[in-house]
Design a protein with these regions (language model features):
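Glycine-rich phosphate-binding loops of nucleotide-dependent enzymes
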Residues: 2-312
Length: 312
């Protein structure tokens, strides 16, 4: 087993040696899913045979509008349930060796797998600090004995506040500590949601479009925070449609289309895959998704806007 935090060069060398095919086994998978299907009426939103997420890496989950990325996130984190399919094995997935197939969203989060949402969930009528404290594990009120013994709950509450203030400084939100969360900008709410997710010291964080609605001034800050998470040993799985971001920070890329995993590999290889480009651009599969000339076209801007509507 590899020691953590990872050395990125060693990680990329390890991943580069893999067979870049859908469902490939990882050297040290923290999350593995099998036979996960979700149908809505006659439409199949997710149909994943097998996929693994490498521990300690930044993995991007990409795909065109309606690919099933957010639905897959919802299934893995207990916000939705798979559809039983006759003649197929029952859906199963495990996190850090523990089965999560029938685990509630609350228990998933307490087990170390935290997610954020494309539309931020900041509690607007609470202060920034209060929002942070909600994300803390082992709240004093969760244990009757601790709640009745003041020295115990006071100590835990003080530790939670110290942790929250540390994270607010790290995310440069400390000046907003006592402000109402509803007064934050869209980008600041993204930072708050990511910071709050770290209150419970997760082993893995799942980010659903972390850059959606973020102005360029905060984009670089978010990128640096995501890379710092990886450098500290936290596994990151994120949905994103900014191909430059995907190429810049990802160690591994998984591609979904029509609910299925159609490709996996290193970012530079996936971006040049004709199957992946075809999934985004149809017949225009002579283009590299990471090229400036492609990203700046009206076609890509239109596709990105359509993709952002996926979970609205």
């Amino acid at each position: 087993m590899t020691s953590y935090p990872y050395d990125r060069a060693a990680l990329r060398t390890s991943l580069a040696a893999l067979d870049q095919t859908p469902g490939v086994s990882k050297p040290d998978a923290i999350l593995a899913a099998d036979d996960v299907v979700r149908r809505f009426g006659g439409m199949t939103a997710v149909d994943v045979d097998h996929v693994e997420i490498q521990r300690g890496a930044i993995t991007a989950l990409i795909g065109p509008n309606g690919a099933g990325k957010t639905t897959f996130f919802n299934l893995l984190t207990g916000f939705d349930r798979p559809t039983p399919v006759s003649g197929r094995d029952r859906a199963s997935w495990s996190f850090d060796g523990r089965s999560f197939s029938r685990t509630s969203a609350t228990k998933v989060a307490r087990s170390g797998m935290i997610r954020t949402f494309q539309l931020t969930k900041a509690l607007t009528r609470m202060t920034v600090l209060e929002n942070m404290l909600i994300g803390a594990a082992n709240q004093p009120g969760e244990n009757l004995f601790v709640g009745l013994v003041k020295p115990l709950w006071a100590k835990r509450e003080r530790e939670n506040v110290e942790r929250a203030e540390e994270l607010l400084r790290r995310f440069k939100l400390d000046a907003k500590r006592d402000d109402m969360a509803g007064g934050l900008s869209g980008g600041q709410k993204k930072l708050l949601e990511m910071a709050r997710a770290l209150m419970s010291n997760p082993s893995m964080i799942m980010l659903d479009e972390p850059m959606a609605g973020v102005n360029p001034a905060l984009t670089q800050s978010l990128l640096e925070h995501i890379e710092t998470l990886r450098d500290e040993g936290t596994t990151v799985l994120f949905v994103e449609h900014d191909m430059h971001m995907v190429r810049h920070i990802s160690d591994w890329v998984i591609v979904m289309a029509q609910g299925k995993i159609i490709a996996e590999g290193l970012p530079e290889d996936v971006m040049n895959s004709s199957a992946v480009i075809d999934a985004y651009l149809g017949a225009h599969h002579d283009r590299d998704l990471g090229d400036d000339d492609v990203i700046n076209t009206e076609m890509i801007r239109t596709i990105e806007e359509q993709v952002r509507e996926e979970t609205r």
